[in-house]
């Protein structure tokens, strides 16, 4: 039998580890859905619900977005009492496409995603759109975290995670993920150098320069079969892992990707809040969507 003092020490250790478990970060849930419509109408449908490989990277004391930014806004509400557990404002590729001439005469479908901490009980997802300065509800769906059809399988790995700058634990820092597209396996070193170069340039500019210690910067680069990305105006088409392309919305230097599903699966192997897609190419181009991602060419 253990002496009383050893029992006390053992009990203290047990309580310590139980307290750690209680404050452990929850998993990361992602709702992938389809956004369909034209300049006048839009509708939504669930694609899949997944549990990403890594724990939730965000600050659990700052789950409510009160900035009133973005063209869309979503809330995760406790289904039992309606309490808002998580919210974020964002914009989307669809939201930009509906301003084009094509949207006046045709419909298109875009893949989109909402990420949030895995809830402990059933929740209601409420999606809102900005209308005359106010967010108005346009779609709802319900999620039971115990649903057997929630996909917890691990997607195809993009390769090793590159730590470019680690200033602290993800929950206490802003996590920026730099993703390479159009880099072959043989160009992995080039991606690493390009990502580090981009990081140094970013932190020479205000307000990033003054807040550098508040950031973690990570890198992922799924290998591409061919070097470079698509540029349809020059007759160049590539099947790059992230699907980035010039000529988005028939604007020659505008680079976005329609492949949201692939982007999110690859990105799930890093803790992130913001994504910068670094395109392997020398022709000037880039773009960005609020709270979605930004793109830039590495060598321009």
Please provide the spans of the model-predicted regions:
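Aromatic sugar-binding surface patches on proteins
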Residues: 93-113
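Short amphipathic, basic-aromatic surface patches that mediate peripheral association
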Residues: 26-65
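Short pre-active-site segment immediately N-terminal to the catalytic Zn-binding motif
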Residues: 188-191, 287-300
